[in-house]
Every structure is written in C-alpha cells, then in structure tokens.
Amino acid sequence: YKYERFGYYYKQHSAKLYPNSYNLDLSSTSPANHPYKFNFPFTHVEFTTKANTLDPQSMRAIKTAIDIGNPILIINDGMQFSAGVNLNIVLDFALEGEWKKIEEFIINFQKTCKIMKYCGQPVISAPSGLAIGGGFEVVCQSNFTVSHTNVVLGLVETLVGLIPAGG
C-alpha cells in the first residue's frame, strides 16, 4: 500500500497503482464526523481509556449499544484497539482483599461477552494495532471482524500469571 493525495493505493502485478476501493478511514465512522455517512443506522462503540483498556464503563457501553438494537461497530482509531482488561482495577481489589469484587468484575466481563455473541444483531469489530487479552476476547465474540493489516492479536494473560477469563 502507498498513501497518496486522495487515499491509499495498492499495487497489483503491474507497476501501476490502483485506488483502494475497500479503504475505510476509521475516523469517518465517528459520530462527530459525518454521522449519516452510511446508509444504515449503526451504533459506534469506542474505548477511550488509557491504552483502550476495558473497565466496567466499557462493559456498560457495549451493553447499552446492544440495548439500542442497531448493528454495532466496535472500532478504535489509534495504536491499540484494546490492551485488554485494566489490570490496575483487579490489582487494587486484590490489594484491598476485595475478592468478591474481582469475581463480580470477571463475571460482568464474561456476561458482556456472551451477550455480545448471542444478542441477535450484527456485531462488527475492526481492530488495528494491539488487540490483546480482553480486547482479543471482544474481537472473538463479534459476528464479523475486519482486521487492519498491522493488527496484533493474542491472549497474553499468562505472561502476568493469569488465565484468559472473558469468554
């Protein structure tokens, strides 16, 4: 691929560059930019925490999007799609001895993933950059995945002594 004045171009077997008609600029899906660009209604979900980590608010956002009833597009324009669950939340609960809260947090994440999988409406994820840990589990629960060429997917919880628990 090569970026020129009006977008990305790709090279076929010949030396000529052809416009990439399948290019989707991630920023074009933002509700603030062209909210009616597409011919069908959809709900745009974007994680906006540091490194797009997942926390209870992220789970609530996904559940709210499902309740709206439109197809769901989970997309983030940045270096990370999602670096997974915010382990600082889990660490804080562990240091305080709040084991029940850790269990509730994990169950909430598991329920959210299952609701995503079986909600009956299309859930589309478009990961780019890192989609690791819980972020990868969100991608796995989607009905459709449109991955960027630079995406890095994986379950990396074992590197910090945990097991994947989202779904």
Task: Locate predicted features.
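NAD(P)-dependent Rossmann-like dehydrogenase/reductase catalytic/cofactor-binding core
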Residues: 1-39
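Short charge-dense sequence patches
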Residues: 11-21, 62-65, 143-150
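Phosphate-binding glycine-rich loops and adjacent basic patches that engage nucleotide phosphates
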Residues: 23-32, 70-78, 99-103, 157-161
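A structural preference for short, pocket-lining loop segments at secondary-structure junctions
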Residues: 40-46, 59-100, 107-126, 148-152
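Rossmann-like NAD(P)-binding element
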Residues: 49
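Conserved catalytic cores of soluble enzyme domains
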Residues: 102, 110, 114-167
